Amino acid sequence: TKAQDRRFDVTLMINGLPMIHIELKNKQHSYMDGFWQIKKYIGEGKFTGIFSAVQMFVISNGVDTKYFSAASDTELNPKFISGWLDNENNPVPDYLDFAKSVLRIPEAHEMIARYTVLDEEAKRLILLRPYQIHAIEAIREASKMGKSGFVWHTTGSGKTLTSYKATRNLLMDIPSIDKAIFLIDRKDLDTQTSMAFQTYANNDLVDVDKTDNVFELKKKLKSDDRQMIVTTIQKLQR
């Protein structure tokens, strides 16, 4: 097929803009065929113009369904492909079940608006993985009921990104919250976390402030600004 004759399978539009693109294969083919096809389309310049708005790709052969964030053809990497899991950690490979869980309204809207991050430093779009999304949703539900709890993560599972989005979403979703405070238990992580949060916030709608000392922390807590504050337990204890 000539490059000019390419025809996309399915594109989902939000407010008139193409945001989610789906490539479908039959069961005799691997879902990865869809990945390589998308990579080829990007290299051919098919996702330009209005289609440059696409933020999420979905690939499926009917029985295996995956998703990943948009990137250039040279940056598109299979390691960023993720399958969907329900909140009990059960895989959701079937394309219809995936569509019901992820691509309905408002789930598709939330995936794009609430669970996508533009990493300013890496110059890369990030789509959160299912366990991160379920953790953030659990935090939101607990906050509505005035409850607290723990979210357990392992090394390399994206704890900082999960923490940023959880803190950010609480601040954006609940008008009565004036300050969202991210508390760190080790001083050496203060600067590191603040820099990561700022990298995520540079293209977001929230202000992230790092506190250099106790005096500055008190000043920020008393201010009328709605903001996200990164600080340490040590500063609060003084």
Where would I find each of the regions flagged by the language model?
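ATP-dependent helicase/translocase motor core
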Residues: 1-179, 188, 192-203, 224-228, ...
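Acidic/polar loop patches that form or flank catalytic/metal-binding clefts of enzymes
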Residues: 203-210
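Short acidic loop-to-helix transition motifs that present clustered carboxylates
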Residues: 189, 210-217, 236-237
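Conserved H-loop
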Residues: 185
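Conserved motor-coupling elements within RecA-like helicase/translocase cores
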Residues: 213-229
